[in-house]
């Protein structure tokens, strides 16, 4: 019997509709394409670093939990460890989800996020929550630190602005990018957040140099940077006290000196997990000074492994960009890895008492909520922007040749 045309077709038991089957095949195909194009080496290195962070937070959690417990509220020794697992789970989902986005979507999303977090940064001094003398968080049911989520969006937006130069060399891209950087740094210093301001300036400097700036301008930029550091020293008491303490040498009661002593206490092989004692006197053992906890409990050899993993991540991104043919991709990935690498090595230098204290976490290792999600977002953007078909050959991007071609094309039109 032929079914009526007015009745919907109902498949028999065990029969699949071709549309549903195609949809499943499309999803599988997209996953296969993603897995083929993604930088799997970078993904494995990041997951390795996060695994090290999981163990390190477990080691540091008892010290911080006991330090922050009160007579009214007693925190479980592994309180921060269990919270960290939740943040890591959300972070990995964020990283993988963002890494699947097409490059254009990743760029547009980052620009929108940059605008939204800039608004949040403007609101922080007025409605933000104050912690340890600084207003950095917005609280509306959850705590959000706009400066953390702004970092990856800022790097991509800055790369997008500087890449305009290829389309029209006459555009004042350096001035536009510099104005954005100055605006953000000014908002950060109002909190104040000197450590994040250094990262934003460093990211801007890396991208401006890579964009092919005239060498004659570098001296002027360096001079402006020196003036900015001097003004910060003179105008901000917190920054001046930290720099003076660093230059004057630590004392037994200085937290940076305590961090260095804790780091060295474990020797080459460490005292063993949960067997360290110096970490108990460290403030923020699970965040700012987790590298020192790693040194005390697991030894300097494991500290060296952590440093090598960071170097491997940086090297992998740079190798991936060697034959890249798109200026925007080169700049955005360079800016993102500059943020992660810069934050990592500032934190490590602080723990070694080679840099003034900045209140900065160790990326992908330290405990954190906003910082963990934001760093996983950073890696996700990096993975999305550097995706490529491994079977296609690529020509290395030449900025000078691109600018010369643009000039020739304009000359021909005139």
Task: Label every model-predicted segment.
Residues 131, 135-137, 219-306, 324-332:
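Hydrophobic, glycine- and aromatic-enriched re-entrant/interface helices and adjoining loop segments
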Residues 2-49, 55-191, 348-363, 367-377, ...:
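Membrane-helix boundary/helix-loop-helix interface segments in multi-pass membrane proteins
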Residues 85-91, 296-317, 378:
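Hydrophobic alpha-helical transmembrane segments
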Residues 162, 198-217, 278-302, 359-373:
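Interfacial segments of multi-pass membrane proteins
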Residues 148, 173-177, 200, 221, ...:
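Alpha-helical transmembrane segments of multi-pass membrane proteins, especially transporters
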Residues 93, 111-118, 170-234, 246:
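Hydrophobic alpha-helical segments of polytopic membrane proteins
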Residues 321-359, 365:
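Loop-to-helix entry and N-terminal half of a specific, functionally important transmembrane alpha helix
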Residues 93, 101, 157, 230, ...:
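Transmembrane alpha-helix boundary/anchor motif
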């Amino acid at each position: 019997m032929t079914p009526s045309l007015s009745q919907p077709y109902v498949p028999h038991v065990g029969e699949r509709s071709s549309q549903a089957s195609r949809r499943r095949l499309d999803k599988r195909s997209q996953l296969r394409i993603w897995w083929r194009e993604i930088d799997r080496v970078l993904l494995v290195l990041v997951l390795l670093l996060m695994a090290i962070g999981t163990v390190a937070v477990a080691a540091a959690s008892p010290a911080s939990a006991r330090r922050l417990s009160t007579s009214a509220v007693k925190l479980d020794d592994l309180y921060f460890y269990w919270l960290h697992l939740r943040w890591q789970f959300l972070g990995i989902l964020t990283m993988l989800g963002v890494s699947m986005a097409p490059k254009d979507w990743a760029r547009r999303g980052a620009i929108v996020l940059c605008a939204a977090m800039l608004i949040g940064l403007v609101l922080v001094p007025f409605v933000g929550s104050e912690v340890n003398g600084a207003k950095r968080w917005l609280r509306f049911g959850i705590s959000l630190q706009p400066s953390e989520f702004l970092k990856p969006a800022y790097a991509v937006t800055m790369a997008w602005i500087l890449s305009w130069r290829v389309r029209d060399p006459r555009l004042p891209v350096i001035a536009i990018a510099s104005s954005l950087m100055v605006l953000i740094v000014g908002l950060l210093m109002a909190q104040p957040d000197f450590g994040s301001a250094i990262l934003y300036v460093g990211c801007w400097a890396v991208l401006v140099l890579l964009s092919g700036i005239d060498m004659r301008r570098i001296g002027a930029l360096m001079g402006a940077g020196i003036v900015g550091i001097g003004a910060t020293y003179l105008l901000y008491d917190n920054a001046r006290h930290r720099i003076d303490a660093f230059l004057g040498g630590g004392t037994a009661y200085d937290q940076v000196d305590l961090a260095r002593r804790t780091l060295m206490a474990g020797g080459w092989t460490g005292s063993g997990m949960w067997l360290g004692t110096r970490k108990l006197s460290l403030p923020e053992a699970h965040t700012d000074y987790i590298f020192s906890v790693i040194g005390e409990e697991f030894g300097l050899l494991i500290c060296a492994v952590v440093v090598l993993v960071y170097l491997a991540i940086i090297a992998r991104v740079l190798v991936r960009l060697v034959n890249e043919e798109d200026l925007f991709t080169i700049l955005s990935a360079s800016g993102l890895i500059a943020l992660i690498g810069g934050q990592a090595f500032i934190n490590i230098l602080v723990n070694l008492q080679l840099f003034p204290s900045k209140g900065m976490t160790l990326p992908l290792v330290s405990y954190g909520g906003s910082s963990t999600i934001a760093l996983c977002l950073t890696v996700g953007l990096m993975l999305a922007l550097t995706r490529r078909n491994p079977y296609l050959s690529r020509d290395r991007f030449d900025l000078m040749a691109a600018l010369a071609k643009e000039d020739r094309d304009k000359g021909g039109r005139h």
